[in-house]
Curated annotation (Swiss-Prot):
This is Ribosomal RNA small subunit methyltransferase I. It is found in: Cytoplasm. It comes from Buchnera aphidicola subsp. Acyrthosiphon pisum (strain APS) (Acyrthosiphon pisum symbiotic bacterium). PANTHER family: RIBOSOMAL RNA SMALL SUBUNIT METHYLTRANSFERASE I. InterPro entries: 4pyrrol_Mease, 4pyrrol_Methylase_sf, 4pyrrole_Mease_sub1, 4pyrrole_Mease_sub2, rRNA_ssu_MeTfrase_I, SAM_MeTrfase_RsmI_CS. Its EC number is 2.1.1.198.
């Protein structure tokens, strides 16, 4: 391993479920640093014991982050090497540590991030949703009004949207997505990533809700919600004749069947017609 610099903070990702996912470099750093700043001592000890690593752990969580950051800066100024870890995944993503890193930059203390696990990116990679542009929104608010306000503000967000959600609120959150964004918007639920009961399921929001309700075990564990971005209908208009045809058919047939027949009669793109009419029917 390369020589450590003097006074360095290492950002060390840890596995999000499968302990085999930890990197060799992460293990080397955890062995060789002077201090490991952990979000949860007991949780991190389980990881260290699994890999036969013994080191000095101190607690840094959201409750003591400000005070502990000051203490750690003093240690770093003395030339100590410190590893920052969270309960799982890459630190700072919904975890404490940002204050410490900011202070490191202020005092010109080197910060070295290690690449590694992140539930949001892991889920996104397997979602099948176009992901060249995406926004990460963290955990959905626990209060319904705040959650609905946020979802409504993202109704026409063209980028793929990523949320974390708990098993306790997943059903209510999917209902709010249907209400505030679109019942027909494609979403993916990625559950228990890298763990034994990992599952990834994608469908329209309304179908996702039905799928979850079919089996209570489908909404157990930690969830990542991925929402397809809003698709704008650019310069797409329909003639009165086409709309009249659709309106007549809609009185007798389902939305899908009415769209299909109308598209065949007028030789137009059924997908564009479908997107157009569902917006009108909302």
């Amino acid at each position: 391993m390369n020589e450590f610099y003097i006074g360095i903070l290492y950002i060390v990702p840890t596995p999000i479920g499968n302990l085999s996912d930890i990197t060799y470099r992460a293990l080397e750093v955890l062995k060789d640093v002077d201090i490991i700043a952990a979000e949860n001592i007991r949780h991190t000890n389980i990881l260290l014991q699994h890999f036969n690593i013994k080191n000095n752990l101190i607690l840094m969580n959201k409750d003591n982050e400000k005070k502990q950051s000051h203490n750690l800066i003093q240690e770093l100024k003395k030339g100590k090497k410190i590893a920052l870890v969270s309960n799982a995944g890459t630190p700072i993503i919904n975890d404490p540590g940002c204050i410490l890193i900011k202070q490191c930059h202020i005092f010109d203390i080197k910060v070295i991030p290690l690449p590694g696990a992140c539930a949001a990116i892991t889920a996104l990679s397997a979602s099948g949703i176009i992901n060249n542009r995406f926004c990460y929104e963290g955990f959905l608010p626990s209060r319904k009004k705040s959650r609905c306000d946020l979802l409504h503000s993202l109704k026409e967000e063209t980028r793929t949207i990523i949320f974390y959600e708990s098993k306790h609120r997943i059903l209510e959150s999917i209902k709010d997505i249907i209400e505030q964004i679109d019942k027909n918007r494609h979403i993916v639920i990625a559950r228990e990533m890298t763990k034994k009961w990992e599952s990834i399921y994608g469908a329209k929001a309304s179908l996702i809700l039905e799928w979850l309700k079919e089996n209570k075990y489908r909404y157990k564990g930690e969830m990542v919600i991925i929402i397809d971005g809003f698709k704008k209908l650019k310069n797409y208009t329909l003639s009165k004749k086409i709309l009249d045809t659709f309106s007549i058919l809609r009185k007798f047939f389902s939305l899908k069947t009415s769209v299909l027949i109308t598209a065949q009669i007028h030789d137009i793109n059924k997908n564009k017609l479908y997107q157009y009419v569902i917006k009108k029917e909302e």
